[in-house]
């Protein structure tokens, strides 16, 4: 219903866009008369008009006309009216729903050119590195011709290369790269280390894939956590001895396991414990569950493979081996234990954001896709994006045949091979979509037996994929591809002219970026030849019936099925599609497979006879709708919980930014000092009369914070009335704040004597950054732990989300208070020296004395900064202190960063891709439950904190 309501205004929007296209057409004649130099000069003219205050909306028709003409001159491609309409829809911040083959990549040139004129940057987001590089080179030719800079962000780039790419007018890249750069910028220790320059306008290609499929998986930067891995091995030993349906049960549909009473007793017996579910043993339950899941739900060579002693995950939808990707929550370690390979460290979150919240940072967001219809409600609800269906340039004439359902998988594949062989014999190109590498290889063997020549796309190399897909429309071509392989590349009947021309030029050693002038000259020479060859072949293919798309299994999302179908019938070409299914397919097994099997058995049909029944088609559609709804709920839930973190993240990141941008922090440090002293005094004077206050304890606590210069007995004696009871809280607080300010001024003089003028400001910056980062990491850790168990609140009739919001807020406020206290303690007590003239390879560890840092703690946690236990000012005098040094070094603060791991969604959104970053030694293999690590982290934090005596109240 909501989808229908959202689509009510579509007709009006399309009419409005038609008017825009007509206006652009009216300007085209004048623009065509301009020389290349005059066309290029238009860019500067537009930039000046924008700088003078002209609105981009008013500039749209002229800018679109100029960009359209440039594309024609450079690429020999002129935007159709429907592409101009699509470009306008993108500029107005909508999702343009354009069918496959309608030229989405070329459409994006128009709004990206227009919005780049403001100088604030445009980000064009694609699904993989190959497409980002291809589009930046291919469409970049148009932008460069018009005098704009184009950059591309790829996964292996250095920070300097990234910074240069972001500084360009238009930047191409993948959603993961943009998101990780944002997180890394908010972990940077200086403004110079940051690479992004704001979030002005984003055009998301394949918007459904990025904003919907991938939105279930947050982007996470993590580092290794301490812990022991022997429990993984212990449970990997126990679980094979347990019997399914005796000791435990498995729900394949929900992918969960449940341990029976007999199973609990068996585990208790094996471990020699009395009660598995008592508090002390509760971490063992997650080890047991993970070991059972590893046994029952994760199959070798289907869900993962073992290569060179490493467990590598296979994406269930694309069939890709995802190098470096690891499951979270100890699941990967459980699989490693099952396969008896080295168990690698469990990771701790250092920074995280969901794609939903990352893309909501943009002032304006838009997107393109061929299949947004089924998700219009979600795009509107979460991103406030309207979906505008752009008419096709030519009417669609593809024939979508009804599904054929076979009893067994073997019978299904035999029928597929028969069909393919028949089509190949008459010269019709065939594209076969499979759901896994295993299936595509099985089908490939069957085709080889039948002597049908074919290409197999196992989706490992995007570049090769694109080349094969570009030729998949040639006469008699048979291509076996996993569902998502080769996305973003058009299958043109007779062969893709642009790709084949580009291929020939690259074979000659020409490149659009390295040798742009030679490439452009040769391009116009080669293009007509290739066009003629392809046109001749296209006629033969059309005669044979166009591209035949054959799906071997239904995907759990209707949208992915539609994408596969949409590869045929582009630009008014003839085409055909059909899905072959069997009762053994994943979707059938999960929903009503048993009912259908009973029906087929009753009908007593032979295995090789398919059924075409409306009931079956309805059942499949219903199953897909259920899965889509479940996934939408999952994404909404992820967003609701991340919304709590998002508010906190904004506060912390804004504070970090303020510190990094060089704001004078003296005032902030003073405010923190006053707040901390006030909190100490409030704690000591909260209850009772003045004579009940334990000032002795208060002074002991204050001495751990800063060198107190007054005695509480003197305060009482100097009181005018002379009675101890006459000392008020205000007088006490006032005296202590004045004393703390005196001590801080002295501290500043000492620091500047060691490290030169302005050293205190630098120390304030270093200390605040270090403490904010560490406290934020600890807070993320605590929030992860809170979220893990919050679902149980529902049993007490409480809304888990409300509880999470309330407790998360309390924890955040507590963290901010602890942050102030720790920062003040550091500013007074951290050991400072002038930085050496020559940078040392490795900083020397300070000697383990009471007045120095706890070296053991610093070694354990490379990012933790310890404090001295005594309240004295620990400044180390150096012989060369008289000589002014360029900077200071605070021991325990400028620590080595741990190796980082990046986790994010893969192209289909279900997978989590990780890659280890540089920055420090590789951590020793470690595991341990989150609870154990949390306790260890707490003890560590306590060890690092200056001793603080208990205060009353």
UniProtKB/Swiss-Prot annotation:
**Residues involved in ATP binding:** 83, 101-105, 490
What EC class is this?
Answer: translocase
According to the record's subunit comment, the protein's assembly and interactions are:
Monomer and homodimer. Part of the essential Sec protein translocation apparatus which comprises SecA, SecYEG and auxiliary proteins SecDF. Other proteins may also be involved.
Task: Provide the reaction this enzyme catalyses.
Answer: ATP + H2O + cellular proteinSide 1 = ADP + phosphate + cellular proteinSide 2
Q: What does this protein do?
A: Part of the Sec protein translocase complex. Interacts with the SecYEG preprotein conducting channel. Has a central role in coupling the hydrolysis of ATP to the transfer of proteins into and across the cell membrane, serving as an ATP-driven molecular motor driving the stepwise translocation of polypeptide chains across the membrane.
Biased composition annotated in UniProt, kind: Basic and acidic residues: 929-947
What residue spans carry the region label Disordered? 854-953
**Where in the sequence does UniProt note compositional bias of the Low complexity kind?**
854-867
Q: What is this protein called?
A: Protein translocase subunit SecA 1
Which SUPFAM superfamilies does this UniProt record tie to the protein? Answer: Helical scaffold and wing domains of SecA, P-loop containing nucleoside triphosphate hydrolases, Pre-protein crosslinking domain of SecA
Keyword Transmembrane attached: no
Q: Does the keyword Transmembrane apply?
A: no
**Source organism (scientific name):** Mycolicibacterium smegmatis (strain ATCC 700084 / mc(2)155)
**Alphabetic keyword roster:** ATP-binding, Cell membrane, Cytoplasm, Membrane, Nucleotide-binding, Protein transport, Translocase, Translocation, Transport
Organism ancestry:
Bacteria, Bacillati, Actinomycetota, Actinomycetes, Mycobacteriales
Organism superkingdom: Bacteria
From the Swiss-Prot or TrEMBL record, what is one GO molecular function term?
protein-exporting ATPase activity
